[in-house]
Amino acid sequence: MVIVIGIDPGVALTGFGLLREAPDGRLEALAHGVIETPKAQPLARRLQLLQQQLQALITTWQPQEAAVEEVFFATNAKTALSVGQARGVVLLTLFNAGIAIHEYTPLQVKQAIAGYGQADKRQMQTMIKALLGLVEPPRPDDAADALAVALTHLHSRRWAQLGA
């Protein structure tokens, strides 16, 4: 059995989703949600809180692999910079925990989950709900994105095993 943590990095909100793949290939959603940092705090403190809360998730769930969404911004340099800083904290925390890290672009995630690179948030949430057998679509969007990136990794993993 393998547990994968999916991460959608951000300073204000970092989405997380944990999936378990059983030896028979069944997938189980273990947990999902967001790590939220208070806007009133200085950036360094917010990044520290992100690291501490991500470390707590790792300690609780003991994932063996991680899937992190690569982020591309073309319009807002300030947002891109802060997300990049959060991504750095996420990657370092995962690396220090000895977790294998895999990265996926938003296009790869949309194609893997919805079969269409231009899928919108609603389409993605509907597919995640169906693929994981959830009662409700995952919310908020950041948590849904994190589940989607974890699911993308598990699909990619299966394809790689078939090709081996």
Question: Residues of each region from the PLM?
Answer:
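Phosphate- and other anionic-substrate recognition elements at nucleic-acid/protein interfaces
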Residues: M1-A164
